[in-house]
A protein has these predicted regions:
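Signal peptide-directed extracytoplasmic domains
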Residues: 28-89, 98-99
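Amphipathic beta-strand/beta-sheet edge segments enriched in Tyr/Trp
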Residues: 57, 61-64, 154-206
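N-terminal segment of the mature soluble domain
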Residues: 5-31, 86-146, 158, 163
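Positively charged, aromatic-enriched nucleic acid-contacting surfaces
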Residues: 1-3
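A short, hydrophobic beta-strand-centered structural micro-motif
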Residues: 37-48, 85-88, 127-132, 142-181
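N-terminal small/polar-rich segments of proteins
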Residues: 133-139, 200-215
Length: 215
C-alpha cells in the first residue's frame, strides 16, 4: 500500500542520513539518479505488532549501501558516532497531544527545538535524532496510550546510545509542567525562551557526558 511505501522511503532516507551524517536530500537523489531504486537495498520488511499497534520494520543491506556510497564518492561517517534519541511529547491543551518528529510542526517551540538539535548535531559531531513516527499508526498511538507503549516500539526500532524523554504539558492558564529527564514548572510568560534555555543546558550536559565516555 502507499502507506507501506511511504514508510519504507522514510526508513531509507533515515538510513542515508545515518550513514552520511548529512540530512541533505541531495545524497538520496544522487543514489537514485545513479539507477539505484530504494527497493534494491531492502533485505526484508515486516509488519510488527506491539501492544496491538502495527508498525513497519525495514532491514537494509548496509554493505551494498556503503559500496554505492563509495562509487558515488559520498563520504561514510564512522559507525562509532554516538546517537541520542529525543522522545518529546507535547500537550499544549489546544489539541491532541503529539510527539515531536521531523515531519510535523505545531508550535513555534517545535521549530526552535528542531533547529537547535540540527545545529548542535553538526557542531558536536553526534547524532541528535527524533523518531520518525509516521512509521507507526500515529493517531491510534496517541489516543489514550501511555508513554511506555511507544517506548517498546522505540527500543525495538531504533539503535541509540541514549534516550532523552521529556513531556511538556500546559497545566493551567499561565503554567507549563515539564516531566521526564527535565523536571520543572515554567510560567507561561516567556515559556518558550525559558524552556529552550533549560533544554539546551540539559542536552549539552548529556552530550558532554556521552562524548567523554566515547573518547
Amino acid at each position: 500500500s502507499s502507506q507501506i511505501e511511504k514508510s519504507i522511503n522514510n526508513s531509507f532516507n533515515t538510513m542515508i542520513y545515518r550513514l552520511s551524517g548529512s540530512d541533505s536530500p541531495s545524497n538520496i537523489w544522487r543514489i537514485i539518479n545513479a539507477g539505484n531504486a530504494r527497493k534494491n537495498f531492502i533485505k526484508s520488511y515486516s509488519i510488527k505488532n506491539i501492544n496491538n499497534e502495527s508498525y513497519l520494520e525495514v532491514s537494509f543491506n548496509k554493505d551494498l549501501l556503503v559500496e554505492v556510497f563509495n562509487k558515488l564518492s559520498i563520504p561514510v561517517i564512522s559507525n562509532s558516532r554516538p546517537v541520542m534519541l529525543f522522545l518529546i511529547e507535547i500537550d499544549s491543551g489546544a489539541g491532541e497531544p503529539y510527539y515531536l518528529t521531523h515531519s510535523k510542526n505545531n508550535l513555534e517551540l517545535d521549530n526552535l527545538l528542531k533547529n537547535y538539535l540540527k545545529k548542535e548535531s553538526s557542531l558536536r559531531g553526534i547524532f541528535l535524532e527524533l523518531p520518525e513516527l509516521d512509521l507507526v499508526e500515529v493517531n491510534q498511538l496517541l489516543n489514550y496510550k501511555r508513554l511506555i507503549d511507544l517506548e517498546d516500539i522505540i527500543y525495538e526500532k531504533y539503535i541509540f546510545d541514549e534516550l532523552i524523554k521529556i513531556k511538556i504539558s500546559k497545566i493551567g492558564i499561565d503554567q507549563w509542567s515539564i516531566d521526564g529527564d527535565i523536571n520543572i514548572n515554567i510560567d507561561d510568560k516567556d515559556f518558550v525562551k525559558n524552556f529552550i534555555d533549560k533544554f539546551k543546558e540539559h542536552t549539552n550536559f548529556r552530550i558532554n557526558k556521552i562524548l567523554e565516555k566515547n573518547q
